[in-house]
């Protein structure tokens, strides 16, 4: 038995399948979005995990025996989020989502000052990417930013809560504007221009890796 998780911006969906990919049960929980200011779009990461556990409870009621035989969990989720994490593995405030536009000025500045970085990143800087948002946080919420020890992306927050592992895959890394596409690793240059030298970035694995 396997579980597939998809953390979307409007809901988290959980599916229980057998070894033949037959869907046995399905659960979905809505996720609220907060918009504290014009152009801002945020969610509470702890609400994601609460919704996940609630969905697990539903599946356990529907298929208790099958849930006890689960061998693995696959994770997917929305990209480009910025979640600041403290030294106790708890989020510092809300996650800033991909459709948040507060870092428009920072994205424009990065493209103007460092045009050569677009080739390394594989794309120009955009407001929804993690790197520009980290630059915005360093300038506009410096106290919160200084508390942060590392960052995570959406699905990787759930991985941390489920396994205690701080990690990501190349897909989320590539969408962060902190990643060198050719070298397939975090770029010190990107990290520096986004004022994020003191942050620890998660270990990167290929997407199919357990």
Give the residues covered by each predicted segment:
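Hinge/lid segment of periplasmic solute-binding proteins
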Residues: 104-116
């Amino acid at each position: 038995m396997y579980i597939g998780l998809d953390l979307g911006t409007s809901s988290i969906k959980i599916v229980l399948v057998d070894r033949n990919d037959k869907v046995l049960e399905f659960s979905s929980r809505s996720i609220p979005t907060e918009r504290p200011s014009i152009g801002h779009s945020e969610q509470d990461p702890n609400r994601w995990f609460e919704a996940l556990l609630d969905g697990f409870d539903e599946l356990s009621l529907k298929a208790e025996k099958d849930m006890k035989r689960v061998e693995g969990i696959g994770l997917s989720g929305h990209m480009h989020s910025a979640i600041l994490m403290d030294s106790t593995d708890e989020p510092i405030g809300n996650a800033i989502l991909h459709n948040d536009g507060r870092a428009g000025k920072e994205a424009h500045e990065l493209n103007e000052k460092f045009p050569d970085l677009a080739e390394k990143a594989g794309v120009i800087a955009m407001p929804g990417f993690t790197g520009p948002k980290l630059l915005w946080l360093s300038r506009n919420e410096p106290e919160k930013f200084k508390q942060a020890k590392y960052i995570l992306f959406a699905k990787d927050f759930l991985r941390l809560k489920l396994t205690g592992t701080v990690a990501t895959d190349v897909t989320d890394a590539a969408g962060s504007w902190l990643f060198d596409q050719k070298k397939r690793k975090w770029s010190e240059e990107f990290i520096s221009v986004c004022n994020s030298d003191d942050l620890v970035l998660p270990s990167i694995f290929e997407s199919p890796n357990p």
